[in-house]
Each structure stands twice: as structure tokens, then as C-alpha cells.
Amino acid sequence: GGYTSTYENISISLPDNVSSYDTLEVFHEHACEDRRNRYAKSEGGYGGCHEWDYLAYMKICDRDNASKCGTEFMRWITTYGRGGRWLTDITPYLFMLQDNDVRNFKYQGANKGTMTVKLLFSDWDVGERSFSGEKMFDDGGQFAGEYNNESRYNRQHNFTALSNYHSVKIVSTITGHGFNQDQANCAEFCDHEHHYFLNGNTAYEWHPIVYDNQGCEKEVDRGVVANQFGSWPYGRAGWCAGQDVKQWTYDITDWVDNSTTNNLRYKGLFNGQEYSPQDTNGGDRRIRANILLVWYAQN
């Protein structure tokens, strides 16, 4: 299929002891046709793996409406011309699953092959476990001069502290896509920053590998599939070809005012400032952002 146009639906029955675990990982194998790297066929054309890197998602469907599957659960970027296997820690999302749950998931991607996905639960005595979460802000947007325009995008989130919580954290999954559209090469090859502001406090996520031509090659120990074809070694903003997209987590427990409504604000910046593209030729420079506020209880 085309760009993230292929879907596969699956229903998973969870055991009766999910709540006893404090760690959640996802194993995913993307095995290409013939389980071979991309190759030229003698009769013409190509076999084996797909040529290009593409986004792939696994989304969890609503508990009360299995046909509504808009909540992101996992994100990957496929390889250039090879298969891949990844093990990803998404422990903050434990709150989405309950004992004896029967949940539907939708896998969304662009490349054919055999897809294996497993949920792995374990207990590491980490001392806390997520029990609630809420989506914040819009899903990124065009990084083209109006990313922080609140008449176009929701960039504020009001919340009140839940009772009996132990900690609360920002959990984000952010990647930038599109290049050769402006002087800074946004949003795939520019280091956009993602800033959060609450009650006089601030923190931000950034992507320092984007200017390193071996940035993704250096990420092999963190899951990047090595020896791909194409430009896979180049560092990107929040991702690498042939890698699971990692969550960014930041503890804001000490920022929260438990006695009143809290207003958490978000901005996407470039070099600490509002981004205005220079020498632009139009095109797409999109940031894909999934940002949650996740609450934890002592475990």
C-alpha cells in the first residue's frame, strides 16, 4: 500500500494479573517478503524488503467502541531495504490496559511482510505504576511559522491534580518529517525543541543527533537496524530509519499545584525561538507529536 495506508486489526485477550506488573514492553518483528533484504529479480523488478523508510503505528481502540482506534500505542520507522526487530519500553502506557481486558488494536503501515507484535509484562519493583493518563495538545502540525499559533492548534492544557497520586509525568512521542523545503531543512533534519511551561517551571526535549551524519549509525545500540541501504546513518529529529520511536518522559510532580487548576503550556521552537522558514519552496514539514500527562501511584 501507499503511505501508512495498510491496516491490520487484531483483538487481544489480556490475563487477569496485568495490574500486578510494573513494566510493559512491546516486541515487534517486521519480516519482509521471502525474509530477504531487497534484491533485484532475474526476471526484472525487486523482491525482498521495501526500498524506503516509512512510518508505522500500532493504535489501541477505545474500550467502549472497538471501531474507534485513534489512540497511539506504538510508533516505528521502517528500514531501507531490510527487515527489523525491536523491543520498546512503553511502561507509561500501562494505565491503558486492565485485568481481563479484551482490547482491539490497529496496525497501520505502508509495507507488506509478516508482522509480529507481542506485549511483554514484567515486574522490576520500580515502586510506581501508571493508573491514569490524558492526551494533551494537538497532534503536532506543520512546522512552518504558525506551529504555536493557538488559533490553529491547541497548545494549552488545564488539569487538576488527582487524589492519592505519587508522581505525574509528561510522556511524549515526537518525530519531525519533511526536508529540502527550507534553509534549515525542517522538520526532519533540523533540531526543533519542544518546551513545556507550568507554574514558573520549564523543561524541553531536543534532538542533538540531527546534525551528525553518523547520528543514527551511533544509535545501533538503541535499536537502529545496521547496514541498511540509503541514507540511514544520518541523524534525524526524534527518529532513525529502522528504529522504534522512543518515548521522552519528564517528571513534573514538583511543578504541580495540588490546590488549584494547573495550566500546562507547550511550544515547538527552533534555536529557542519561534520558527519562521527561510528560502521556503512550500512543501510539507510536519511534526508528529503524541503528548500525554500520565499519573502514577505507589506500587
Give the ranges of each region predicted by the language model.
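Extracellular/secretory-pathway and virion-surface proteins
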Residues: 1-299
